[in-house]
Amino acid sequence: MADTYRTERDSLGEMKVPAEARYGPQTQRAVENFPISGQRFSRRFIQAMGLIKKSAAETNLELGNLDPGIAKAIIAAAGEVADGAWDEEFVLDIYQTGSGTSTNMNTNEVVAHRATELLEDAGSVHPNDHVNFGQSSNDTIPTAIHISTRIAIEEELIPALQHMHDALAEKATEFDGVLKSGRTHLMDATPVRLGQEFSGYATQIRKGIERVRLVAAELEELALGGTATGTGINTHEDFSRHTIAKIALATGISFCEADDHFEAQGAKDAAVNAAGALNTIATSFMKIADDIRWLGSGPTSGLHEICLLYTSPSPRDRG
């Protein structure tokens, strides 16, 4: 059993780490300290962390903060992390220390280990002194939250919502000539066209997209550069501006430095606002689904105004 582990040392002492792992003692301590949910960070979040470390190393190389060989090795290793080459090395539970220090160090250790491999015998890369140079968990983790969420909104959520909107709008046109009873509190009311009801559903989704775009703009403000407490202590005055410009270039999204680092790090109001927009969209989904279910109820004792295709056997078809 001893052959499957290696012993590493950090400020708290010795720690046994799986022999083949590219993470180090701080990650292993977090594995043992926080075995809470079994849920790990998403690919999007790991991608964002890799992008931050790569962009930071590029800036530190330009500013002369790191040895060129070490900086280039970090750039290559962090690029591999961003591309998904080492996702299995990100072993931590999403529930951990409030600042996300464990995941920041997981990233630093994986990048440092891989960068040292790339250097072969030409040097050694330290997770704190080199990979995390000019950064803190308190600004990198909030930055990764914004980057990963903003990219997911752009690449996944909005296209899916647009597809749903287009399908509902198409049905609104198709059903425009279908006359039915309107209802208030389920009681018959003045006539409406089925297409009009579906146009309302399509508009709900369109407005949901508009709301998401508004909150997405807030997520483009990044906390990077505030370091530990928002003051920017121990980092170069040009570090955040240059690094965020690189992140914006790599993603094609207009990321910028937060105008107030104390707000950006002391609160997550932009993320809460985004969650609110998602909650509104989910509520729209529930409303639409409930209406369609009600319209399709029956066929003998419900409304049965529309026919829904079976997606699974009905209980009455069994036995």
Feature-to-residue mapping (PLM):
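Conserved small/polar residues in nucleotide/adenosyl-binding loops
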Residues: Y310-G319
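Long, charged, glycine-rich C-terminal linkers/tails
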Residues: I94, H304-I306
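A helix-coil-helix interface module used to build multimeric assemblies
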Residues: A2-G226, H236-A250, R316
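Short, glycine-/Ser/Thr-/acidic-enriched flexible segments
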Residues: E20-R22, Q28, V110-A112, N279, ...
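Acidic, glycine-rich loop-and-beta core segments that form the ion-binding/anion-interacting portion
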Residues: G230-H304
